[in-house]
Structures are given as C-alpha cells and as structure tokens.
Amino acid sequence: MVKYTEDELLEFQEIAYNPQPQVLDAFNQMVDEVREHANAEIERQKHLKWSNGDTYIDENGNERPYHHLNRRRGSRSGAKPNLKRKGAESVTVDDDGWATLAKPKKSFGAEEAGEERTKFRDSLKDGSVKARPNNKNLGSSKAVDPRDAIADKNTISFNAFEALGDDSDDDDE
C-alpha cells in the first residue's frame, strides 16, 4: 500500500474527483465530532486525576470539586494549633500611669470557698480519719501486723564454705 504524507493528501484533495460530496462532508463532520469528544475525554481524565468526580455548588452557583477540602494526607511537619483558651488578661492603670496586669485565677472558687476550706481542715485536725480500703480484689481483709513482717526476714544465712572450714569443731567431739 502506498503511504502519503499529510501535505501530499492535501494537494490531492483539490484535484480529486468526488461523486458524492455530501457523504464526504458528513464523514468529515463525524471525524471532527469524534476528535472533540476525544479531547473532552482527555480533559475529563486530567480533571479526575485530581478529584474523585464529586463536586459541589459554591455560594456563587459555580460547580467546584472537593479536592481542596479532602487532601489525602495532611502535612505533619507544621506546628499544631494551641486549642487551650487563655482567659482575658485585664490591665488596670492607676493614677500615676502605672499599668498592672491581672492574670485570671486558675481555680474557679478560689476566694469564695476559703471559709469552707478552713472549716473542713479544722475538722480534720480535731479527730483522726479512718480510711477503709476496698478489699474486694485483695486476698485477705485481715490487717497486717508489722511484727510478722519483721519475723519473716532471714537474719542468719548458711555459708557452705564456712561449714567446710570448721571441720575441726565436729571432729573434736
């Protein structure tokens, strides 16, 4: 089969005989539509590479993809935000122009419950508080005698080398 370049085909098109030009025009129109469809498909594939096809309508009515909202993995190298809220620091300026910074108290009832706290502490000083442990998971509820713990200690240990060296004591008898 003879192969022609594109330029040669364009030259032959002008001098070629075409008995049915409407068929050729319909064929050329179909080729153009297929070419446009292929280009649109390539663009759609490029677009789908960066998103999964899900879109939403923004406040202006434009359709936008979600790819800027749900990245696959966020960066862990950046600083994490400090989510603890700090109380408002109040600055008081006196007559001389000195500014004093008053930090908020850390406990909520620091000054209101002062009397109740001292009353509770005084009641504890007067008598002894007996605490009973929860013996549900313990082996025995019997109180431990400290003298038993001392008696369990080994005070004398047996040394075999000293026993071998002291054969003279046993032989004399």
Swiss-Prot record:
InterPro entries: Caf20. Coiled coil: none annotated. GO terms for biological process: negative regulation of translation. Keywords: Cytoplasm, Initiation factor, Phosphoprotein, Protein biosynthesis, Protein synthesis inhibitor, Translation regulation. GO terms for cellular component: cytoplasm. It is found in: Cytoplasm. This is Cap-associated protein CAF20. Signal peptide: none annotated. Acts as an inhibitor of cap-dependent translation. Competes with eIF4G1 and EAP1 for binding to eIF4E and interferes with the formation of the eIF4F complex, inhibiting translation and stabilizing mRNA. Belongs to the CAF20 family. It comes from Meyerozyma guilliermondii (strain ATCC 6260 / CBS 566 / DSM 6381 / JCM 1539 / NBRC 10279 / NRRL Y-324) (Yeast). Residues 49-91, 105-149 are annotated as: Disordered. Residues 115-129 have a biased composition (Basic and acidic residues). Its main location: cytoplasm. GO terms for molecular function: eukaryotic initiation factor 4E binding; translation initiation factor activity.
